Amino acid sequence: MALRPAKIDRYVDKPAYTRREYIRGAPGPKITIFDMGNPAGDFEFEVALHTAEPVQIRQNALEAARQQVNRYLQKNVGRSNYHFKIRVYPFQVLRENPMATGRKADRYGNGMRRPFGKPIGLAARLKRDQKILSIRVNRQHLKFAIEGARRAAMKFPCKCYYRIYDKEGNDVTTKILSQGL
């Protein structure tokens, strides 16, 4: 079965559906690596990507963003000069009621009888202003981290914004951007 458009699953309008012990056939997570680069490194700044609205992000989008940002940072910054971390986990099990279409579909389709649906994928459920990912770098690589966050935001079905934090966790976005990169 083909992958449905992400706009179908992005809204947080249903109750959470996460208890795998009760779900038969729940798929495993496609995203397995959450820390990339140099996790033990000491970096000056952290560029964090936040959501602007409550949303569900499918695991396919998270994995696509992870691959894109990691490849971009490895190429431009070097493996030991950044720490990239995905901060959300896809717990929410998405389900679909497959509807029969085509000729004589009424003979073998169930329609809305027992319409609960079968598990088709996983998604991460995010609140407004929650961090999706963070990239820790030093000052000379800050523009590459901002560009990586921008590229990751294109993969997600919601409006996103980035913030720059210093070592202590203070928001220094306006200060850094006013000084120029």
Swiss-Prot record:
Database matches in CDD domains: Ribosomal_L16_L10e
UniProt keyword annotations, A-Z: Ribonucleoprotein, Ribosomal protein
Alphabetical GO biological process terms: translation
GO molecular function: structural constituent of ribosome
InterPro entries referenced in this protein's UniProt entry, alphabetically: Ribosomal_uL16, Ribosomal_uL16_arc, Ribosomal_uL16_CS_euk_arc, Ribosomal_uL16_dom, Ribosomal_uL16_euk_arch, Ribosomal_uL16_sf
Gene3D superfamilies: Ribosomal protein L10e/L16 (3.90.1170.10)
One GO location term (cellular component): ribosome
SUPFAM superfamilies from the UniProt entry: Ribosomal protein L16p/L10e (SSF54686)
Domain of life: Archaea
Family affiliation: Belongs to the universal ribosomal protein uL16 family.
Protein's recorded name: Large ribosomal subunit protein uL16
Organism the protein comes from: Pyrococcus horikoshii (strain ATCC 700860 / DSM 12428 / JCM 9974 / NBRC 100139 / OT-3)
